[in-house]
Amino acid sequence: MRVLGRMAALVGAAAMLVAIPGNARAASPKFSETTTIGTHNAYEKGKYTYWAQALDSGASLLELDVYADSVSRRWRVSHDKPLANDNNCEYADEPSELYSKDRNQDLGSCLDNMAAWNQLHPDHAPIVVKVEMKAGFNNDAGLGPDEFDTLVSKKLGSSVYKPSDLLGGSYSSLDAAAKANAWPTRDALKGKFVFELIPGTVEESNPLDSYWTDEEYGDHLRDLYAAGRIGEAQAFPAVLGAANGDPRTSRYDASIRPWFVFFDGDAATYVNSGYDTSFYSTNHYILIMTDAYGVSPAISSTNPTDAEVAARLALLAKDHASIITSDWSAKSASVLGSVATRG
């Protein structure tokens, strides 16, 4: 009975968080002040037939796995095929072509789909595009941070919310801007994509590679800022892995620590281990909690009830998550599009 009571209370809390009484219009919260839901590996055809359907889903985060293919010098999108594409992205760059063209395309086509979809939905809620660089960048093959930025900028242009937008000409680092809560409101981010970069599983297991995506892109941001070119950067690197306290201090050189304001780790590790996650909301950092289903009491990783999702959202909002993710692609847009007040 105690568990059921707690569940009911959390569901009620979730409803209260998003309700607006009568005709009152609540002020739009900042991006850093809400908790939303994302879909793990949304590029997989088993989750959505087309990438545009993933964009339709209402989810606030969609994930792409990307390989830097040094043989063809192309960005491949696949879970485990570094030299091929295996995904739901189409060869389509016009709205009329979506939901009908050949799939299994490269990253450029995934971005083309996003640009076409954006024309149909110019006021969509902000969407974080989480890019796992499976084997890391390959600068020697012309597939490094500069080339990634160029591709994203070419395909999506002003629809990307960039690090320079957070700096706003007023702050000398992303850390300083985040601590000042310089994030825009969710309304101001309508029609925008926000790119998050994380190291990949192949990269992490490669004994010959100790210079991972997060550090490489952190160096990239630092150097662009020093050169007066920070406006070229298109993504936010994330500190990967749940930790207690500030994980930047033990992982990065002091010169790049201030360029990390995204953090990404396992929800159960954060919550069940009793970590003090208030650190993230106090500093207005973006905290992505993955595998949200696994927090005790565990729920389905694929198709929990709507009430279970609402309760999990409320619980992890209280634990200071910005976005919670799982494989909940079967849920409706009204569920995946839920927005709660953070912390």
Model features per residue range: what roles?
Residues 1-26:
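Secretory targeting and sorting signals
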Residues 27-343:
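Catalytic cores of phosphodiester-bond hydrolases, prominently lipid phosphodiesterases
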